Amino acid sequence: MFKGAGVAIVTPFKEGKIDFAAFEKLIDFHLENNTQALIVLGTTGEASTQTMEEREALIRLAVQRVEGRIPVIVGTGSNCTDTALQYTRQAEDLGADGILVVTPYYNKCTQKGLIEHFTQIANATKLPVILYNVPSRTGVNILPETVATMSKVENVIGIKEAGGNTAQVLEIKRLVPEDFKIYSGNDDQIIPIYACGGHGVISVASNVIPKEIQEMCAAFMEGNVEKALEIQLLYKKFIDLLFCEVNPIPVKAAVSALGYIENELRLPLTPMEEVNRKKLMDEMKKQNII
């Protein structure tokens, strides 16, 4: 689907509504800075707080603005299979290039339930499907054997692995076909996931430093591990601060500091604590990001 750095793009809000003008500017920012894919309506995009109508407008704008230059991948997961199917059909109808499907959250289903859930969604679309494992948020871990089962479904082409367990990533790599894509879901594990046979990252940090994250990925893919590691280490503290409060609270503060968006979230998310915001701003100044 893509190799390198895709951005899990934030959704800008202004006075409670989506700021579409700001969203266009963000897309242009990523096109100018070599981002390899646009992931819309994911965790970082606050998808769970948006209506069907808002989703439609956001997807439509992303597809139109990108004009096929990079893949537009839409988060269509839900803890209700029927709702996930509706989101998936909507994304396909609006011209998305692929979908990202998170494990059902709160329900805490079995591995059998995961397989049936993902299979129904994959069978309902011609789009490439990327599974999304983030057990810290969902309460459910996709086991490597389950990933291997799903990899046999023709249009299930990869996984965003945000479990933080490199041993699990290695086991997935051992079990799946060679062309099955493994993307890091954690910015602090880009190099480790590459070393486990990964193909890139679906990145939060790319909202702020897209050029640098893609340079890190490109360096590793070109065999320059030393340069890739140098970039990973250079921005380690910044990346840590992006997750000192729950995502996307810090990254929205960071993108706001760049001047692209208002620092606005939808409840139940609230703005960053001032003590943490100051640490983030200080590090951004230190790294000449602002």
From Swiss-Prot:
One of its GO terms (molecular function) is 4-hydroxy-tetrahydrodipicolinate synthase activity. PROSITE patterns: DHDPS_1, DHDPS_2. Its EC number is 4.3.3.7. It catalyses: L-aspartate 4-semialdehyde + pyruvate = (2S,4S)-4-hydroxy-2,3,4,5-tetrahydrodipicolinate + H2O + H(+). Keywords: Amino-acid biosynthesis, Cytoplasm, Diaminopimelate biosynthesis, Lyase, Lysine biosynthesis, Schiff base. The record marks 43, 106 as: Part of a proton relay during catalysis. Catalyzes the condensation of (S)-aspartate-beta-semialdehyde [(S)-ASA] and pyruvate to 4-hydroxy-tetrahydrodipicolinate (HTPA). Belongs to the DapA family. Homotetramer; dimer of dimers. This is 4-hydroxy-tetrahydrodipicolinate synthase. It comes from Alkaliphilus oremlandii (strain OhILAs). The lineage of its organism: Bacteria, Bacillati, Bacillota, Clostridia, Peptostreptococcales.
